[in-house]
Amino acid sequence: MSFYFVQKPFEKYGKTLIEHVNISVEPGEHIAIVGDNGVGKTSLLNEIFKKYEDNAYLMKQDMTVYHDIIAMDYIMSLYPECLTIKKAMQYNYERIADYIALNGYEIEQRILTKAKQFNLTEHDLNQPIGLLSGGQQTKVALLRAVISDKELILLDEPTNHLDQAMLADLVQYMNKSNHTLIYVTHHRGFMNETASHIIEITNQYTRKFIGNYNQYKEIIDLEFQTQVRAYEKHQKEIKELEQTISRVKEWHYTAKQSTSVRDPIEQKRLSKLAQKSKIKATQLTQKRNDTNFEEPEMDDRHFHFNDQDVLRKRNLLRIEHFSMTMNNNPIYENAHFEIKNGENILLTGPNGSGKSLLIDIIRQRLIPDIGKVHITPSLKIGYFDQQNNNLDYDETPLNMVLDLEGMNRSHAQTILASFGFNQYKIVHAIADLSMGEKSRLQFVLLFFSNPHLLILDEPTNYFDIATQNLIMKMVQSFNGQVFIVTHDVYMQSQFKATHWEVRNKQLHNLSLKQDKKLNVNDTLRLLDDYKAIDENGHFETDN
């Protein structure tokens, strides 16, 4: 069936988000929705779902509210009667017959079979969702969407936290799917591989384009260049118009001054010329003032960071011969990791391999079962949290930015405006912001708190593409060091760093060349480091 959604205006909490929404979707179309953070993409998905609830399934991006629920139970909740009987069977075996009658075991088997396509084990499905990695949580949400088997599937940020292998599997699934798919994503590569159409959302309208993201971008770029040429032409016309106005005013002044001549015929002619010149000048001035042609905007925002205390240590941190087990599952075994002064870090690896766990060790939230952690005592770490747990939802964006050291009101407003926060949003509760806006605010707080080391865990998940480009500019101009965990291939290609990969319970430095020749100076520095080894073979604590 076809799906239509028309609303004028499109509002949320009494506030107009989009002046005019007009969306038509044909059966089997795979549509990616693009637009700035806070424009209403998630709200639009919710409203479409409400209209077509009997024929649609909505995969939500935030799994926090389900953290205490067993993953299998979350999926089985699609069949509430089955789930109720399944739980009752733990205490009353007589309900087994009812469970069989409802095809409960067949549903479970179907879930387990589909789970294999998402690299989810039965053990994973029997865990509370909160104990799963961000990528595994996304897989569970996607699995539930697939099991629902609705005609229209709405996906909110389906690529978040997914490793490259799972992303490739998702691309394959979507390209084979006969379902009608509408999804919000900021992943350019994913849109290029899966989208048959793009819907662009602005505060004024929605527009539908045939093709993937690159094809959409070509059209938008062409439109922008056309607008630039039209603006330049208009500016030239305005300049010529102003020159004409100046000449006409000069004629009027000259004619008026000359009306005192004695020849009555010449006096009449000059008086008439003065009057006409005055009228013409007024008309031309009105034409200039009535012309409203705004200069096309380009995304070219730049930021400068305050100087930081210089750290003199050769190694900011070092974790030696460490092992770690979580829920009886070994994550690391005799692994090694270090961050050298002046070195940026890119960390990759499959979902559930231990990337977030390593961050928790670096942030001293966890201690390895075995091994020793050396961190420069004066090291100031800034951490970007996937769940925005660092935000006070009752506060306003402006107040939180003003709490930063050395921040004044004018500077805070300028920074927030550069990140797309208007005067209304900066003075209202953070709880009312979209997920993307909350992430943007967290970035502002993180970058302008001047840490020595920025740890960014999946920084592009909730950002529109313009903000992603801005973030990369900020990272490249940052005075300190940056540690990024990302599955985004585009960001990986743009970020110059030492590349570490989590694989087979080890951390591998992919930037090391196996055929590297011996460097005498490097070797001497290493020997100096080894002088600090104690009798147990561990590095002594840095002072």
Predicted regions and their residues:
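Flexible nucleotide-interacting loop at or near the entrance of a catalytic core
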Residues: 96-106, 224-330
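ABC ATP-binding cassette signature C-motif
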Residues: 1-227, 311-543
